Amino acid sequence: MVVFQNFSLMPWMTVFDNIRLAVRAAHPDWHRTNVDRFVQRYVDMVGLTGAERKRPAALSGGMRQRVGLARAFSTEPKVLLLDEPFAQIDALTRGVIQDELVRMWTASRSTVFMVTHDVDEAIVLSDRVALMTSGPEARLAELVDVKLPRPRSRAALIDEPEYLRLRTHILRFLVHGARSGPGEEPRGLPEDARETTRLGDPMAPLTSAASQA
């Protein structure tokens, strides 16, 4: 199952019907009553109770993405792919929906792959970060284990040494290791890298820095 950056909802359908479409496809033998009860569970889970009959045009970007997440998790997938799901959402809403994503993952324990250009988002949400070389022939350069304990508080992470170490490591990769050319092995990080990383606002989005890598 995939959650896209551009929401990809059926514009003529309500919130409830967009989610129900996925549930019925996943469970064609279910009675309508069971389907509706299951759909309502996921509507409530993403905080859209009361908005069930609204169509996508009447929703904010954050609400639309909540519908997309609810639709994806309602199929109870073993593997879920998130393609920059928070890229079009403002920073405050992004944090709220990220927390909802973690809660849904905690309940389902599905395997989730998320594509992101935000270094902090990757560290806060994931158990492992896959660092890729630059395109057009991008390859896996390194797997970074994120062993920060859960649940993770953004406020607490700001002063967490392991969080700062991970953030610095990934940023240095973007500077030193991501630009391996075609036919070259990923260079990785120089052990004697001397550049320092500005950590004044460790939770700031880093989309520009990552997308240039």
Regions found by a protein language model. Name each.
Residues H27, R32-A51, R103:
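Conserved ABC ATPase "signature" region
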Residues M1-F7, T111-F113:
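ABC nucleotide-binding domain signature
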Residues R55-L59, M63:
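Conserved ABC ATPase signature
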Residues S74-K78:
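A short, proline-enriched helix->beta-strand linker immediately N-terminal to the Walker B motif
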Residues L80-D83:
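Catalytic Walker B motif of ABC-type/P-loop ATPase nucleotide-binding domains
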Residues F16-R24, D36:
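Short helical segment in ABC ATPase nucleotide-binding domains corresponding to the A-loop/adjacent helical element
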Residues L69:
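Hydrophobic anchor residue at the start of the ABC signature
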